[in-house]
């Protein structure tokens, strides 16, 4: 069975990484998230001004933002689990 991927990140791969690797991925994803949020704001302004030609791009950006937030949630849970395991 093929494992699930979100934005090129394999979910099973995430659970096999160390805490340091997960923190690095988290920082990378937060940077992408900020970039996408700024781009979304820019596109919304363009849409209001009537200069946006591809209105579907707003929907696509919102979906990408949701995917990144999902990944961040998974990574945060995995970091918590690994920290709990290391304390035992």
Swiss-Prot record:
InterPro entries: Ribosomal_uL29, Ribosomal_uL29_CS, Ribosomal_uL29_sf
Keyword flag Ribosomal protein: yes
Pfam family, one: Ribosomal_L29
Cellular-component GO terms for this entry: ribonucleoprotein complex; ribosome
Transmembrane portions of the chain: none
GO biological process: translation
Keyword terms, alphabetized: Ribonucleoprotein, Ribosomal protein
Keyword Chaperone listed: no
GO molecular function: structural constituent of ribosome
Cross-referenced Gene3D superfamilies: 1.10.287.310
HAMAP family linked: Ribosomal_uL29
Family, as annotated: Belongs to the universal ribosomal protein uL29 family.
Protein name per Swiss-Prot or TrEMBL: Large ribosomal subunit protein uL29
Source organism of the structure: Sulfurisphaera tokodaii (strain DSM 16993 / JCM 10545 / NBRC 100140 / 7) (Sulfolobus tokodaii)
Lineage: Archaea, Thermoproteota, Thermoprotei, Sulfolobales, Sulfolobaceae
């Amino acid at each position: 069975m093929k494992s699930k991927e979100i934005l090129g990140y394999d979910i099973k791969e995430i659970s096999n990484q160390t805490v340091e690797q997960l923190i690095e991925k988290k920082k990378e994803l937060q940077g992408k998230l900020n970039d996408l949020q700024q781009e979304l704001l820019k596109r919304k302004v363009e849409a209001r001004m009537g200069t946006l030609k591809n209105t579907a791009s707003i929907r696509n950006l919102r979906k990408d933002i949701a995917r990144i937030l999902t990944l961040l949630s998974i990574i945060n849970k995995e970091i918590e689990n690994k920290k709990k395991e290391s304390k035992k």
